[in-house]
């Protein structure tokens, strides 16, 4: 079907490709400047002259097109910036030139990622062709135990489903454990839907959603829900009580194990941040583990946005983290994509709160273990992978 896109996003890593394709189409003006969002987050600030020049070209194009929703370096990661600024709305179609654009499904939007050429088509017409995906229903009954977080739940589901188990499916999340997740936790969950192959991940909007969007939504919205008698290609039911702290081991996101099975693994670096776990709630969890203590390995913390950083400063979270010996970097993607601000050396091991641990992701010969902020912080204290329940 040919669908009308409500909001389109491309960041500094993909917008230049989309802009070049747009120009090759000999288009002069975008379909609607107010519906395009351009954040600089992937290599921000620029790490080379080449990156700086490409960013300069994007800024010039943004000015030429009179695009008002441009977010400079330091404003934050695209998948945090869009929700904070009210673009992620229930019932809307959001498309981003980034695979983790499915994050916005946490607000009841249909959100997905596309390539730069498809984004150029959206820039030009505001439309894009989609194959309507079949749906999976995942229900998580009961409540998560103390010290078990949204990231643990997410990794557990990916481990059960596999990296291709939900390929091109719309995965809908239900159950008490899902309802009890904060908005930030739901963003973590939907952010990683792509890691099981999903086209999108969706949490039905509720009062938590609407409260978050008060005084924030950029437009009126109408929530959309599945019919009570909707049929699904597959349905899965899990018990939240079965979930303990999880770790995704190198070099696949679905290589998931309970933390106890990898406890004691040597760690060279800990990274807490990214579009998966760089929100205020995540920093607060890390601070609760590190308060009054000192990290024993280099620990990099990168808030997901400037607003997140300011909030963490205001409520004392950042002071706790800095006193614990962490390194603070500019809000953005940081070393997640292996470009700057903490890439790994040969054979080094990192516990990261990111969403991918592929070989070469943070350095060609590094090893990445994905975990929650609590597990990451606990590991920063001991210098080895550690169960946060023991701290």
Swiss-Prot record:
Positions with a binding annotation for [4Fe-4S] cluster: 275, 333, 336
Pfam families documented for this protein: Aconitase (PF00330)
Gene Ontology molecular-function annotations: 3-isopropylmalate dehydratase activity; 4 iron, 4 sulfur cluster binding; homoaconitate hydratase activity; metal ion binding
Annotated keywords: 4Fe-4S, Iron, Iron-sulfur, Lyase, Metal-binding
Pathway(s) per entry: Organic acid metabolism; 2-oxosuberate biosynthesis
4Fe-4S keyword on record: yes
EC supergroup of this enzyme: lyase
InterPro entries associated with the record: Acnase/IPM_dHydase_lsu_aba_1/3 (IPR015931), Acoase/IPM_deHydtase_lsu_aba (IPR001030), Aconitase_4Fe-4S_BS (IPR018136), Aconitase_4Fe-4S_dom (IPR036008), HAcnase/IPMdehydase_lsu_prok (IPR011826), Homoacnase/IPMdehydase_lsu (IPR006251), IPM_dehydratase_rel_enz (IPR050067), IPMI_cat (IPR033941)
BP-aspect Gene Ontology terms: L-leucine biosynthetic process
E.C. designation(s): 4.2.1.114
Subunit structure: Heterotetramer of 2 HacA and 2 HacB proteins.
Family: Belongs to the aconitase/IPM isomerase family. LeuC type 2 subfamily.
Function: Component of a hydro-lyase with broad substrate specificity for cis-unsaturated tricarboxylic acids. Catalyzes both the reversible dehydration of (R)-homocitrate ((R)-2-hydroxybutane-1,2,4-tricarboxylate) to produce cis-homoaconitate ((Z)-but-1-ene-1,2,4-tricarboxylate), and its hydration to homoisocitrate ((1R,2S)-1-hydroxybutane-1,2,4-tricarboxylate). Is also able to hydrate the analogous longer chain substrates cis-homo(2)-aconitate, cis-homo(3)-aconitate. These reactions are part of the biosynthesis pathway of coenzyme B.
Name the record gives this protein: Probable methanogen homoaconitase large subunit
Species this protein is from: Methanosarcina mazei (strain ATCC BAA-159 / DSM 3647 / Goe1 / Go1 / JCM 11833 / OCM 88) (Methanosarcina frisia)
């Amino acid at each position: 079907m040919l669908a009308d896109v409500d909001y389109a996003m491309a960041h500094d890593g993909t917008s230049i490709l989309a802009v070049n394709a747009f120009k090759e189409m000999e288009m002069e003006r975008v379909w609607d400047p107010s519906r395009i969002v351009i954040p600089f987050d992937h290599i921000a600030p620029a790490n080379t002259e080449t990156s700086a020049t490409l960013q300069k070209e994007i800024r010039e194009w943004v000015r030429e097109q009179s695009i008002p929703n441009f977010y400079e370096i330091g404003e934050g990661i695209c998948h945090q910036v869009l929700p904070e600024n009210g673009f992620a709305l229930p019932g809307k179609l959001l498309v981003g030139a980034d695979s983790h654009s499915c994050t916005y499904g946490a607000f009841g939007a249909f959100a997905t990622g596309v390539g730069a050429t498809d984004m150029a088509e959206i820039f030009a017409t505001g439309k894009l062709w989609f194959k309507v995906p079949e749906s999976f229903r995942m229900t998580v009954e009961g409540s998560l135990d103390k010290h078990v977080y949204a990231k643990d739940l997410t990794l557990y589901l990916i481990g059960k489903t596999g990296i291709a188990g939900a390929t091109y499916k719309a995965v809908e999340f239900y159950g008490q454990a899902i309802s009890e997740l904060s908005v930030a936790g739901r963003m973590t969950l939907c952010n990683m839907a792509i890691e099981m192959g999903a086209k999108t991940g969706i949490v039905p909007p509720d009062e938590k959603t609407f409260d978050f969007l008060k005084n924030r939504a950029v437009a009126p919205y109408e929530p959309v829900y599945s019919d009570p008698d909707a049929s699904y290609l597959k349905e899965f039911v899990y018990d939240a009580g079965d979930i303990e702290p999880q770790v995704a081991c190198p070099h696949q996101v679905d290589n998931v194990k309970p933390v106890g099975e990898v406890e004691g693994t040597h760690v060279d670096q800990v990274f807490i941040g990214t579009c998966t776990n760089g929100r205020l709630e995540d920093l607060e969890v890390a601070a609760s583990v590190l308060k009054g203590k000192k990290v024993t390995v280099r620990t990099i913390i990168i808030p997901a946005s400037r607003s997140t950083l300011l909030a963490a400063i205001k409520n004392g979270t950042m002071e706790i983290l800095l006193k614990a010996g962490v390194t603070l970097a500019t809000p953005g993607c940081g070393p997640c994509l292996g470009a700057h601000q903490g890439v790994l050396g040969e054979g080094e091991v990192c516990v990261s709160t990111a969403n991918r641990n592929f070989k070469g992701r943070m350095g060609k010969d590094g090893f990445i273990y994905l975990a929650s902020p609590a597990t990451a912080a606990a590991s920063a204290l001991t210098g080895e992978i550690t169960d946060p329940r023991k701290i």
